[in-house]
Amino acid sequence: MSSIRNQNDNRRPTFRDHRTPQFSGRGGSGGGGRRLQNPAHYPQRRDMSPIRRSSAISPVRRSQDHRQRSPEVRRHRSPEKESKDAVVTSTGSSRGATSASVTSSSRRHESGERHRETHRREDKEKKPEKSTDRDADRSNNIAARIQAPVVSSSTHHHHSNRHENRKSTAVKRPAADNRPMTYSTDVSVSRHSENRRKSSSDVSRRHGDKEKRDRKREDVKKKSNGERSSSSGRRREEDHKRKSESSRKEKKDEDVKEKVVDENKVEDEAVEMQGLVEVDCCEEEETIEQAKEHGSDEPERPESHQSAHSAAVSNASHHSDSEEELDYEEDDIDVDLDGDIDVETMKMAARGDLKVDDTTDEDEINDVKDETMEEQKEDGEPEKKKPRTSENDDKDKKHHGSSSSNSHRRREDDKDRRQSSDHHKERRRSPATRQRATDHKESRRSEGTSTRVESAASAAGTEIQRIPSLLTMRIAAPPGIKKLETLYHSGSGGSSSSSSHSSEMIIVGETFSNRWCQCSCAHHLPTTSSAAAAAGSLDASPASSSSSSSNSDASVSRIPSLMSLRTPFNNSCLFLAPPPPPSSSSSSKRSHEAAARIRAPSPPRRSFGDRGNRSDEHHGGSRHMDVGPQRRRLQDHRVRDDGRRVSSFEDRKRPERGFQDSGRVSLSLKHL
């Protein structure tokens, strides 16, 4: 009985385990009665501490099993000892015939040895490369050597850990994490497991060392194997040879791979270096430079971002010269234009006004540019800046040595120019005409026929219906136009035409509300008064210049950009509609139109905290304020616990939590 009990001791305890170990009988549980024995008499099984845990005393079978032995212990066994074992196995039978001293016990020992031998061989066949590598690594890896616990007996090492860990799932001493912590995308965070521990200088040297060591071991084994010509010995030798050869091959392959990878890296770096004449410490400009060199259309963006922000909108201040732009640099705006792009179109792209279908080609874009220029001329305003054509760009490149510095200078100019108000007006006016719908030709025709103000009005009126599909939409477009942002976030006061602002907000909201935001983040607007208000705002728009301009503005960028919405939004919200305006809170909180009510209204939330103090949120809803908190609480209990009441899903959904959750024990006790 006791042996069985010992095997299972480290599993769940019985109630008897809590008695003091002195009084537990020999077959009993506590320490098995063994605690008071002096462990010095049993050196082969000695434990680290004099208090002997029954879990450390394991059945004999397990102590002899080589698989539980820690690699350190196995490493310290000398080759002579191993050869001795082998000799016993091979020649035992013949010796048994001659000498009478071979008792049954020794024979049993031999059979055990033989058994273990086969085990070991199978194991090696299963994982040939692993075992040697692990040993060698153990000896190499200094950190592991320092951290490894001193092992007196392998069984104790194995079990005591198990014993202490029984309740926790966590590993006791996790390996030190060697991976480089980096936020940059280009460096892969988890490197290949083989390269992790090696510094590049050490790699080859260590490989060499390992091979030398392997050779030495083989020599020793050959010497010791000289005497024995047994089949098992031969087999083991062959296994070993095969193993070492395979490991060597693997090492060679790894080396080759590493070399190839390194060469690729070097080439990449060289390519990066080639285009750069003068670098202004901004990574953006490097990417622009490369783009101009290789004629790629992708990384043209960053420069345009910086120039496109107006001072109020840009996320990084202007003084940090676009070093830390937010993370929409990679792949958000997908405008494909071939060759050089002039600054104007790049700005349009950054603002999100320029919609390019996959089919459009250069001349269409040029047409649109020409239209905008003509309209500016008709306006009678001296045109401030011509859209930059590729020839101009080339001239610039010839005049000023490096185009990276050139782009820098251009950006500075833009900054200076941006500060002036007339530039604001011009910028505000032009986008409405530049707006390009997916039904490209129709919109262009309508724009061509109408005059300027009419086009603005039509843009506000007709294009509201066009809600972009996910494909055309750019969720993380760079920051939008300044006016639009103030439009979303303007308070009640602060601007002269606040009324027109609110009406415009409703227009924009109406765009999104009908099938826009699927999540509960309150970014869709209740569209109660929106139609009338929209009509009113359209009529009233010519009244004041600011309102008209901002009106066209609102129609220009349908989709507010992520960055221009400074409000917190929850991440489940894919489509960001503008948040409801603070001014129009007169309408009811929850509108019950089909558009606004996307999911069924949830039951009112009850807080976990001090339930007693809340007057409005309790089950009754229309309960009188004057009823004391004690009575209300009692009623609460009665309602909840009444057996005859049909339990609905909502009751089961949020069970009443215990007092320790509320954190205000004294309060809740007072109320009881």
From Swiss-Prot:
Keywords: Nucleus. Residues 8-20, 62-85, 107-138, 189-226, 234-268, 289-306, 366-375, 382-396, 410-424, 436-447, 607-626, 636-659 have a biased composition (Basic and acidic residues). Residues 25-34 have a biased composition (Gly residues). It comes from Caenorhabditis elegans. Residues 1-463, 576-672 are annotated as: Disordered. Its main location: nucleus. Together with unc-5, involved in touch neuron axon guidance. During gonad morphogenesis, plays a role in the unc-5-/unc-6-mediated migration of distal tip cells along the body. It is found in: Nucleus. Highly expressed in intestinal cells, lateral hypodermal (seam) cells, Pn.p ventral hypodermal cells, and spermatheca. Expressed at low levels in the ventral nerve cord. This is Protein seu-1. Residues 322-343 have a biased composition (Acidic residues). Disulfide bonds: none annotated. GO terms for biological process: dorsal/ventral axon guidance; locomotion. Residues 87-105, 307-317 have a biased composition (Low complexity). GO terms for cellular component: nucleus. It comes from the Eukaryota.
